[in-house]
Amino acid sequence: MLAFVSLPFFFESVLHRSQVETGLLMTPWPLAVGIGAPIAGRLADSVSAAVLGAAGLVVLCVGLALLADLPENPTAAEIAWRMALCGLGFGFFQAPNNRSMLSAAPLARSGAAGGMLATARLTGQTIGAILAAISFRIGGHSETVALGMAAALAAIAAVASGARLYHPAGARPPKPAIVADAP
């Protein structure tokens, strides 16, 4: 969320793009999530969430770093492919990670697990917005600082996701859910 909050300010303040251009430049990210997440969801049946999540976060980290290091006066295409890379990475992280969290809960607690997932997501979005506001307060090229912070956080999260491989449950693909007949 830190990156997604700071990017419109980056496009307008640093790159001097109009509001319409900024809106269009934001579009490749969610489009790539829409492409990457279903693919990652299918792969999650045979590849562990730790591997997919770590790979997705590495791709997101690289995309954010490339956005923070854009050339002077970049073209829309130079921005768009970096945004798409971020979205693809985010989609590859989000789908298997959500599946892993929800499938780890007992069936009777699936509603609570969904609630916790939503709470964690909202907490992350809030912290991201706070970090963006703090970076804007710093001054200078604060939008670039925010993108750098987002890339660093994605790198840390990639390491944490990869560390799940060393946990017995994280080293193998999740088992398919078995729904028992109610008595």
Regions found by a protein language model. Name each.
Residues M1-R172:
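12-transmembrane solute porter fold
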